[in-house]
């Protein structure tokens, strides 16, 4: 499959500036394209302004635009486009921001851009997403960590990769927390979806996909889950081509 993907676990590390750690990767990802204008999908950003979703999306666009402008890139948001599907068809690259994955998926289906983005990526359009934006590149949203604040018409997502990502993957619960660990939740998913593979993508890491090549980048290993198997660790630089 033709695809150029930058799938980022998280936007910001503790104590760092917004989109601080992945900036150089974003710059490197976009450099060969010569593309400067990137269509931004802000639909996961529901809590940036309490007055309305529209103002929340405005605030999200402004925040991301400030970072991307420092990289010589321009963000323009799909929520301001009269025809979202037409905007995707004309876009040279797309960036999908993090936040609530359920709201993101609901809006992507409602506006009709889910299938359109998939087709454009298959035609060569560059796709980047962080957190929820990496989740929607998967077959389904079922390995998100988010509260189901709204009900999408379908859990189906872009299906740009044949495996699931669990972004912000944590190895253990915070001290004193009595709920399930992230590993237990993923194992529950695999009990019901036994033919799927899940990548636990730790913070400060990303997956770089170039057609049928995939590479883990960042400063930490990833964790691979399959039903009936012990989880496996893969370091940066490991051969993970089998995922595709």
Where does each model-flagged region fall?
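Catalytic-core regions built around general acid/base machinery
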Residues: 90, 110-124
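Catalytic nucleophile loop
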Residues: 95-98, 121-140
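A general structural motif
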Residues: 2, 33-38, 91, 124
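Hydrophobic anchor at the start of a short beta-strand
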Residues: 36, 75, 127, 222
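C-terminal and late-domain segments of enzyme folds
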Residues: 2-33, 43-45, 49-59, 143, ...
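Portal/gating segments that form or line small-molecule/metal binding sites
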Residues: 39, 45-109
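Structural motif
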Residues: 6-7, 93-97, 128, 165
